[in-house]
Amino acid sequence: MKIAQIAPLFERVPPKLYGGTERVVHHLTEELVRQGHEVTLFASGDSMTSAKLVPCSDMALRLNPAVLDPIPYHMLMLEEVRRQANGFDVLHFHIDLLHFPLVRSLAGKTVTTLHGRLDLPDLQPFYAAFPDVPLISISDDQRKPMPPVNWVATVHHGLAPDVLPFTGQPRGDYLAFLGRISPEKRPDRAIEIAARVGMPLKIAAKVDKADAAYWLNEIEPLVRRYPNVEFIGEIDEGQKGEFLGNARALLFPIDWPEPFGLVMIEAMACGTPVVAFRCGAVPEVIDHAVSGFIVDSMEEAVKAVHELDRLDRHTVRATFDRRFTARRMADDYLDLYRALAGGAQRVMPIHAANESGAGPGSARVA
């Protein structure tokens, strides 16, 4: 198939540091190319891909201090997509909602994966105005706040199986927190859990400008107060395997409707179990007492850390291999692309089809 992947321009594909959406687009694109499809990637000019790259900005917008407004760059990208649209069987958008007016006339050959939270009140009237645009959720939980829209599938994220090495015997005896310093990610909970169990905590996270006050006023004082807490800062892909692989567990103590939580499957790829609070997509990603523990309170989180020895790291990795590889993700999307190309208007959620006996990597037309 001739497939266009349209990525955000904020980070390169794949991102140098933080950037979950761009990382997923990278793994999907590379796997589609590996399977022999003709893939074109619309992304920043510094992106690295096996697909044909259409550069839509010189570099990732977040890394360019001259960029004051990202919207014009994305609109220019959409104009280029519109110009080339007839050359593709499928246009797969990963840029939230900017393209919706454009794709109404192309709805039969487009899909849009929504990567972010959908519970913001401003979004409800917008999505209600576009009930014909085919949408893909990255978890069933992500859909809950939405008005009736044209959901065609749920496709869970996946990663290339060799991107993060399995570690059977971690060299560290620490807990890990990886991602972003923000109130909804609850690094304060991670610090409290580590203090209560008496284990070191390593925090590898970025601090956005929007969260600078939260870091300075809330989290940095806690880091200074507890000698067992080490703040590493933002790490790159090459550092992530060692950081996660040598941890006893990843702490994922969120209290917001996390649409997916890519870091959870990154930890699982390393064989590292996850202790996660029951929010958002967590119950869809973590197999309780298999790849980690799902908890509802600080007391349960502390108990889960004490019970980590019950979990086998080989089983954690096997769960990743069964559920969260890039091949499984690409196969799910290909089933969807083909169903839509064949005129299907609705497709069952991918994992719902699996649970009903359709088998892994399959979508069923509803």
What are these regions (language model features)?
Residues 1-366:
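Catalytic cores of nucleotide-sugar-dependent glycosyltransferases that transfer UDP/GDP/TDP-activated
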